[in-house]
Amino acid sequence: MKKLWGGRFQKTPEKWVDEFGASITFDQNLVKEDITGSLAHAAMLKKCGILTEEEEGAIRQGLQTLLQKAEEGTLEFSVDYEDIHLNIEKMLIEEIGPLGGKLHTGRSRNDQVATDMHLYLKDHVSHIIVLIEQFQKALIEKAEANVETILPGYTHLQRAQPISFAHHLLAYFWMLERDKERFRDAMKRINISPLGCGALAGTTFPIDRNYSAELLGFDSIYENSLDGVSDRDFILEFLSGSSMLMMHLSRLSEEIILWCSQEFRFIELDDTYATGSSMMPQKKNPDMAELIRGKTGRVYGDMMGLFTIMKGLPLAYNKDLQEDKEGMFDTVKTVEGSLQIFTGMIETMKVNKDIMKQATKQDFSNATELADYLAKKGMPFREAHEVVGKLVYSCIEKGIYLSDMAFEEFLQASSLFEEDIYTVLDPHHAVEKRMSAGGTGFQQVEQALVKAKACAGI
């Protein structure tokens, strides 16, 4: 069949060439953005005297009919018309006649698709920011209930020092806060209109790019038409921010997976967020956390894929840019789904406070408290470190913990020890006394919750 751009050609492509080159199977996700952009373009053409009021009215009515069908899911797309733009143009012509062909005046598919993607990310990044805030609120709620819940803190996945569980959860709150700020900052680059840049050099028609940008809710326009149609840095910035967000979600997923294992038993996931085994009846697998951990690599791949596509492209538009969309769609779906799943997972998980507390009493995570105790009494910290290290070794040989040692053994190690040492070794006391700003002390955690609530608008 004859192409809308086929005037220069004597032959039509083979069907397999059409199928290979078509993007409608995935860029139909931009249908609402494409129609919305066309409505603004038509209104601008009328304002500039390029379309009459009657022409613009007919085009607007036709586009609104198509938009309603899109919302109802009744539009039928064809690879014969390659992409979302030509499919919509063909449908508009069928709806209102040859007048539909006037809509493309002063516009190219190059600036049209860039506009569609800017509109798409404007909407979805705004939604992602809302989802991050909902997840942050879930973390705050769980943290508030666990300020004095104590568990081992880890370095190298070895028990290191006792900490407040709320302190641990709030670490992720602040990571998410930075993620949120990155997305907000990215919106400055997303909220720019390329509409009217044309194929690469602008247009000879007396259009008003600022007017169409205003109608679409953009803050500004691209100052250079080559830049506006050819760069995808706004998508890369979104993918980069998404990769960092997913990295944070993956780290928490890893901890969730560990914590709900029989080796830890610190938490129990709600049945909604776990699955069983087809062979082993006893299994309760943390599949949602594992999937989020796995999908993080997928988002990394989307980012690196577009970086690789972009690195060798001369100005301006190249067909390679058809490959910029699937990774963007995939990342949006993955990020939105991961945040929604994680919010529910945190809200419904059961915290086994007693098991967490018991874990702090069956290790040497209070050894630092012992070294600090000696240092506060005047012993150089390096010497105190050596003394306590030897006490830990002695305990390991005897199969006991520091709190089990007889007071005489402490005195043999140093005359600076007094009987208050057993209070110092208590995990609750150890956490309570860590009063430095940003630390795990209960008072500091309460202050951190106040700041977190302010950031979350609670």
Swiss-Prot record:
One of the Pfam families matching this protein, by short name: ASL_C2
Record's catalysed reaction(s): 2-(N(omega)-L-arginino)succinate = fumarate + L-arginine
EC number(s) from the headed UniProt entry: 4.3.2.1
PROSITE patterns noted in UniProt: FUMARATE_LYASES
First-tier enzyme category under EC: lyase
Record keywords: Amino-acid biosynthesis, Arginine biosynthesis, Cytoplasm, Lyase
GO BP, one annotated term: arginine biosynthetic process via ornithine
Major location (coarse): cytoplasm
GO molecular function, one term: argininosuccinate lyase activity
Pathway(s) where this gene product acts: Amino-acid biosynthesis; L-arginine biosynthesis; L-arginine from L-ornithine and carbamoyl phosphate: step 3/3
Location within or outside the cell: Cytoplasm
GO cellular component: cytosol
SUPFAM superfamilies listed in its UniProt record: L-aspartase-like
HAMAP family for this protein: Arg_succ_lyase
Annotated family: Belongs to the lyase 1 family. Argininosuccinate lyase subfamily.
Protein name per its UniProtKB record: Argininosuccinate lyase
Lineage of the organism: Bacteria, Bacillati, Bacillota, Bacilli, Bacillales
